[in-house]
Design a protein with these regions (language model features):
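Short, solvent-exposed loop/beta-turn-alpha elements that line the ligand-binding surface or hinge
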Residues: 82-86, 168-185, 230, 281-307, ...
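Conserved small-residue motifs centered on glycine
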Residues: 424-554
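Conserved N-terminal structural module of periplasmic/extracytoplasmic solute-binding proteins
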Residues: 3, 36-237, 300-304, 519-599
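Ligand-binding "clamshell"
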Residues: 158-170, 198, 361-388
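Short, Lys/Arg-enriched N-terminal segments with co-localized hydrophobic residues
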Residues: 1-11
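Bacterial N-terminal signal peptides that target proteins for export
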Residues: 12-23
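C-terminal motif of bacterial Sec signal peptides marking the signal peptidase cleavage site
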Residues: 31-35
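Helix-loop-helix "hinge/cap" segment bordering the ligand-binding cleft or interdomain interface
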Residues: 170-173, 196-271, 292-344, 401-438, ...
Length: 599
């Protein structure tokens, strides 16, 4: 899945968010013994309850204190484990997405642990990755839908703002109901507001460092050595390297790629455009939004009408003319490209775009080929531009937990989900709730991926095979950057070894991409946050959006391949976009963006 922040005050909001998450995380892991772990829960609870009773003895009965604590009272579960069980145990129906590596949520070990801890029983309804949206929409439309929805995001503009099936949470977001959540996101609640200014869902974070620099290009260094050339750093040098490669390997592919959306950042245009202007797209989409950015004056613009975009197309056409770009780059799937990459004797591939090399080459079955590829930093273009897209809004997402009007006790539902925002909520749901068996905190003498003292060590790793001990990727991820980078890692791990992928991607992102982000380079354009439109706004531009994207994508291929002459066809291309309603599309985006800023 992809993750988006919903507010535009980039510098201040992002700084505040990172500070809040870092402070929350640091405080949480300093506790050391408060949250989950089946062997220690009762001991921790009894000790803390006794302390609470002693402190409150002068004014109230200890049972009253315990009751207050179990409804929140502003004290987080990390601070006081007597927050659970909840005061009003409930049974809720819930819809979420199933995953093939989790056998049965109803009988899952973590499900049982969470039910015993909180006193809340969940009756699950699920849909697969392929059909959850259709299944959930049918339920919401029929009137037969669950109390809560989590781990998937329905159309909040339609089912929340317009129809009221999903209820606003503003009145329920209190220290009594969700103290852990507010500890982490209290200053960022605006990021989850919909077009009417109300909050219909909870935020979550999965701050994957290398995912924010996902427009990576992998180049085969063995071929560079054979050609006697260095890693190219400019568009001119890249052109020369491609030409020399094709002279030596006439059947080779100098610059591979896939149809947009087939892989994870696997179309070469995303990476190569940064030599001319910012590519402002987002993951997993192929619509006009991919070519929409905001300038320093706060104006929404379409980069596909910029003269620098025309220069980009001209450069791509020059690569196409020498065979560096081939027709398959625009049509093939990720699996087809994977087949090409893994058959170098038939079709040697010099460069291939992808967020991670592991999507193409398996380090275990093909270690030699795996080690031949290294990341290629963005190239410096003719005017000195050298950019990579920093997906700054990919770390935090709204739409992670919602309550419907069927739910008779929203407060208790929020108290239940608040566990996921506690210091060990992510560890327990991802890897299991047995501290000392599934994970340990603050492992002595070990360091994290960032070189700092490790915050935790995973003992029961992620499994792609069916299991029923934990939820793995199901549900709500609460993983700030410091938390992800704080996982214990062997400092001497071979980045190209079976256990070195995270190290490889982290180093590549930090060294070859982060220095060239739009923020670091003070670029004139920036990426947009997710546009939180009303249902009417979305409907009004839906046809325009499809038509504009079609013109941009089809014309891009035509100009690059020479099927359409760039100089003689450029004005006609711009005219086609105007006739398709590009100005109306940008006006709608502008209105939504301005509204979001004012909230």
């Amino acid at each position: 899945m992809h993750f988006t922040i919903l507010k535009w005050e980039v510098k201040m909001k992002r700084k505040a968010l990172k500070q809040a998450l870092a402070l929350s995380l640091a405080g949480a892991f300093a506790l050391g013994t408060a949250a989950c772990g089946s062997s220690s829960t009762s001991d921790s609870g009894s000790t803390d309850s006794a302390a609470a009773s002693t402190e409150a003895a002068a004014s109230t009965e200890s049972t009253e204190t315990a009751a207050a604590a179990s409804t929140g009272s502003g004290a987080t579960y990390d601070d006081d484990p007597s927050f659970y069980p909840v005061k009003n145990p409930q049974e809720f129906t819930a819809f979420t997405m199933s995953m093939p590596n989790v056998t049965d949520l109803a009988t899952n070990d973590f499900t049982k642990y969470l039910e015993n801890l909180t006193g809340v029983k969940i009756d699950f309804e699920t849909g697969s990755r392929d059909d959850w949206q259709e299944k959930l929409n049918l339920e919401l439309s029929s009137g037969d839908y669950p109390d809560i929805i989590f781990g998937v995001t329905p159309d909040l503009a339609k089912y929340g703002v317009e129809e009221g099936i999903i209820i606003p949470l503003d009145d329920y977001l209190t220290e009594e109901n969700c103290p852990e959540y507010l500890k982490m996101f209290k200053d960022q609640l605006d990021l989850s507001r919909e077009s009417d200014g109300k909050i219909y869902s909870l935020l979550a974070t999965n701050d994957c460092y290398h995912c924010k620099y996902a427009d990576k290009m992998w180049i085969n260094t063995k071929y560079l050595d054979e050609l006697g050339v260095d890693m190219p750093t400019t568009t001119d040098e890249f052109y020369d390297v491609c030409q020399k490669f094709l002279e030596k390997y006439p059947n080779g592919i100098a610059l591979a790629g896939t149809a947009p959306g087939s892989g994870w950042h696997s179309d070469f245009q995303e990476w190569l455009m940064g030599s001319f202007l910012l590519y402002p797209g987002r993951s997993y989409t192929t619509n006009a939004y991919d070519y929409t950015a905001v300038n320093k004056d706060g104006k929404i613009v379409c980069v596909a009408t910029d003269d620098r975009y025309k220069d980009f197309l001209e450069y791509c056409n020059s690569l196409y003319k020498i065979g560096a770009i081939y027709d398959g780059d625009f049509t093939q799937t990720q699996e087809q490209l994977k087949t090409l990459v893994n058959n170098p004797d038939q079709s040697p591939v010099l460069c291939m775009p992808e967020g991670t090399i592991s999507d193409y080459i398996d380090v275990v079955s093909n270690p030699d080929l795996y080690k031949e590829y290294a990341t290629l930093a963005p190239l410096e273009g003719p005017d000195g531009t050298r950019l990579t897209t920093y997906y700054k809004y990919s770390a935090v997402s709204s739409g992670n937990f919602m309550i419907t009007d069927k739910c008779k006790d929203p407060a208790t539902a929020l108290q239940w989900v608040d566990f996921f925002y506690s210091s060990k909520g992510d560890l327990c749901s991802q890897y299991g709730a047995d501290e000392g068996t599934d994970w340990v905190l603050n492992p002595e003498g070990e360091v994290g991926l960032n070189g700092k003292p490790a915050l935790y060590k995973i003992l029961n790793g992620y499994s792609g095979e069916p299991q029923n001990h934990d939820w793995q990727d199901i549900g709500i991820r609460v993983a700030p950057e410091d938390y992800r980078l704080g996982q214990a890692t062997d400092p001497d791990v071979d980045p190209y070894g079976p256990d070195g992928l995270e190290k490889l991607l982290y180093d590549a992102s930090a060294n070859n991409y982060a220095p060239y982000s739009q923020d670091e380079q003070n670029a004139d354009l920036d990426v947009l946050p997710e546009m939180k439109m009303s249902n009417d706004e979305s409907s009004a531009i839906s046809t325009i959006d499809v038509e504009v994207e079609k013109i941009i994508s089809e014309s891009q291929v035509a100009f690059i391949t020479g099927a359409q002459d760039l100089d003689s066809g450029w004005d006609s291309y711009l005219d086609s976009l105007n006739k398709a309603g590009l100005s109306d599309l940008l006006s709608t985006y502008q209105a939504v963006y301005d509204r979001m800023q004012s909230q």
